[in-house]
Amino acid sequence: MVFVSKVHGEIKYEEKNKVTFKKGILGFKNLKEYALVDLKEYEPFKLLQSLEDDAAGLIVVSPFEFFKEYEIKLNDEDTNRLDIKNQSDVVLLTTVTLDSDPKKITTNLKAPIIINISNNLGEQIILDKSDYKIKHLLIEE
C-alpha cells in the first residue's frame, strides 16, 4: 500500500503495519489509523504516520535501544483494552522530538505507545506513578 505524506513523501507500507488507536494519540485524538514504517536510513527510528492526515506523523523508537533498564507495568485494564494475550505480541515505542543538535534529541518515556501486533491495536498510555520524564535526553552525557 502507498500513502503520500506532506513531510516524508511517498510511504510504502503493508497492511500488517497498519495500527488502530481507538483513543487516538496525545495531540492527535481525532486520528485513529496509522502506519508504522521502518526508516531504514535512520534505524532504529520508525515513522508512525497518520493515514487520515498527510501532515501528521511521529518519529518513534523502542526505548530499549537507548535505555536497557526502562520498564513499565501494564495494568489489567490496559491489557484487556488492547486484548493482549502474550507478552511477545507487545511492541513498546516512545515518541521522539528531533533537534539539529543530536545531544538535544529527547524521547517521551512518561507516555509510551503500546501496540499489540497480533490485532494491530495501539494505545498511548500515561505512566502516572513513575519518575520517567516527558522530555528525556536520548543521548546522556
Swiss-Prot record:
One of its GO terms (cellular component) is cytoplasm. It comes from the Bacteria. GO terms for biological process: bacterial-type flagellum assembly; regulation of translation. It is found in: Cytoplasm. Keywords: Bacterial flagellum biogenesis, Chaperone, Cytoplasm, Translation regulation. NCBIfam families: PRK13285.1-1. Acts as an anti-CsrA protein, binds CsrA and prevents it from repressing translation of its target genes, one of which is flagellin. Binds to flagellin and participates in the assembly of the flagellum. Belongs to the FliW family. Interacts with translational regulator CsrA and flagellin(s). This is Flagellar assembly factor FliW. It comes from Clostridium botulinum (strain Eklund 17B / Type B).
